[in-house]
Curated annotation (Swiss-Prot):
Interacts with VE1. This is Sexual development regulator velC. Residues 239-422 form the Velvet domain. Belongs to the velvet family. VelC subfamily. It comes from Gibberella moniliformis (strain M3125 / FGSC 7600). Residues 423-437 have a biased composition (Basic and acidic residues). Residues 192-207 have a biased composition (Polar residues). One of its GO terms (cellular component) is nucleus. Pfam families: Velvet (PF11754). Keywords: Nucleus, Sporulation, Transcription, Transcription regulation.
């Protein structure tokens, strides 16, 4: 500050002390939100005319706001009021508010360069910020935004009364209110927490390995390679060494063509039964029995011509949308004992029908499915195939009738195999026998219906 400003401040202070005081001290206090109030501290002696100049000229953040001598200062408090001393300041009003005028009462205490708080507030604060302090604060905030983080000495929210304020070049340097300006500490990086619940990158040096969340447990990770290999049977590893054979224990003989409707459908008689055999000298009986009890064998059935070289599943061109062989064309294995008491693996086809008359063969294909590799392999290889003997499909007039169920069929039925039992009928001898199956009932009902029609035609 120049010498001229100091002399001007000293002259102004003398003129203010010489002015008559005409306003009473009982003047109401101005609004608490628009006045910056100051109070001297009797703990220290006056510091000179420089502090008197600061008492009259206060700086606001929006510009220099000159506070005239008519404003009431905290030194003009009544006798019964005892302000608390301190080195802070309090800003009771808004930054841009204009204070109200107050007459200057007579002095009761000598002015001091130390500041105290008003009796209307209990918070401690510091003196107003000078333009240089505001510029310094703005530069610090700019450095913080640009990544340059200066190191600040630790500060306290309250200033001790025993420590006098420091001055630079004869000027009192105001302190900064730490309640209003948060201190800048050293920079700490906190990695953001994502909303999707995924852990942060483990390669980052700021991430602790103990804070990482483990990946969710998957069932595929629980099964080790050894457990997976043990869950598979030994047939997978020795398929090329084993010799699979199919023996048709019950050959199809005759069938009645069912046409192109679903109502008048007849099954192939007798129902085909195929047995799986494994012949390998390197395997014991227990190992062979284990292979035969494998539950994931699947056998499919298709129809071939009389020679057995051409697939006859497709119909003539006028009925291209339909198949010749209909019914349940796939069978699961059934492990049981035959009529001789020997255990075996059987595949039964009790629901096969042919649409057109002719001579045909049935073609059986065996496939072994591995459930573990079912998602990886689109098609499993064929183990073995077999063809039946030639059977004849008759029209409704030429069909000789159903045969009685064999001992093998009855034996498998007793053990739980899903297959129908028939007593059989012989049309050549004009004998009718009741059948406990649906096919036998349909044949008997059809014969009765035909007899009624003949009687009606004879009466007419």
């Amino acid at each position: 500050m120049s010498l001229t400003a100091v002399e001007t401040a000293a002259g102004t202070s003398q003129r203010l002390n010489a002015m008559p005081q005409t306003m009473p001290e009982a003047m109401p206090h101005p609004h608490a939100t628009t006045i910056m109030k100051w109070a001297p501290d009797t703990h220290y002696p006056p510091q000179g005319p420089v502090h008197s100049y600061y008492d009259q000229h206060l700086y606001s953040p929006t510009g220099q706001l000159i506070v005239g001598p008519d404003h009431r200062r905290p030194s003009q408090l009544q006798q019964h009021q005892h302000p608390r001393t301190g080195h802070g300041y309090q800003l009771n009003g808004m930054p841009g508010s204009v204070p109200q005028n107050q007459p200057h009462p007579p002095h009761s205490h000598p002015q001091s360069g130390l500041y105290a708080t008003d009796h209307t507030a209990g918070q401690q604060a510091g003196p107003p910020q000078a333009p240089s302090a505001i510029l310094q604060r703005n530069s610090e905030m700019l450095d913080h935004a640009q990544g340059r983080h200066p190191v600040y000495a630790p500060r306290s929210h309250s200033v001790s009364e025993d420590q006098p304020p420091t001055s630079v070049h004869g000027q009192h340097r105001p302190s900064i209110d730490m309640c209003a300006v948060p201190p800048f500490t050293e920079y700490h990086f906190n990695p953001p927490v994502t909303t999707n619940g995924r852990p942060p990158d483990s390669n980052s040096p700021m991430v602790s390995p103990t804070g990482l969340r483990p990946d969710p447990m998957r069932i595929a990770d629980i099964l080790t390679t050894g457990e997976r290999s043990r869950s598979r049977t030994s047939v997978d590893n020795r398929l090329s060494d084993n010799r699979f054979n199919l023996q048709i224990r019950q050959q199809p003989v005759a069938a009645r063509s069912c046409g192109f409707g679903e109502r008048d459908r007849r099954v192939i008689d007798p129902p085909p039964i195929v047995q799986l055999l494994i012949k390998d000298d390197s395997l014991t009986k227990e190992e062979i029995a284990k292979h035969l009890r494998y539950p994931h064998y699947v056998m499919s059935c298709s129809i071939f011509d009389e020679s057995g070289s051409c697939d006859a599943s497709f119909m003539p061109e006028e009925y291209r949308q339909q198949r010749r062989l209909m019914g349940l064309l796939v069978s699961a294995p059934f492990v049981g004992k035959d009529e001789h008491g020997e255990e075996g693996c059987f595949f039964c086809f009790p629901d096969l029908s042919c649409r057109t008359p002719g001579s045909f063969r049935l073609h059986f294909t065996l496939v072994k499915i591995d459930p573990i590799r079912a998602k990886e392999v689109k098609r499993f290889p064929t183990l073995v195939t077999a063809q039946s003997e030639v059977f004849t499909v008759y029209t409704a007039k030429d069909f000789p009738g159903m045969q009685a169920s064999t001992k093998l069929t009855k034996r498998l039925k007793e053990q739980g195999c899903i297959i129908s039992i028939k007593k059989g009928n012989d049309r050549s001898k004009n004998t009718r026998s009741h059948d406990d199956s649906s096919d036998g009932e349909q044949d008997e009902g059809e014969a009765t219906l035909q007899g009624k029609r003949r009687r009606r035609s004879a009466r007419q």
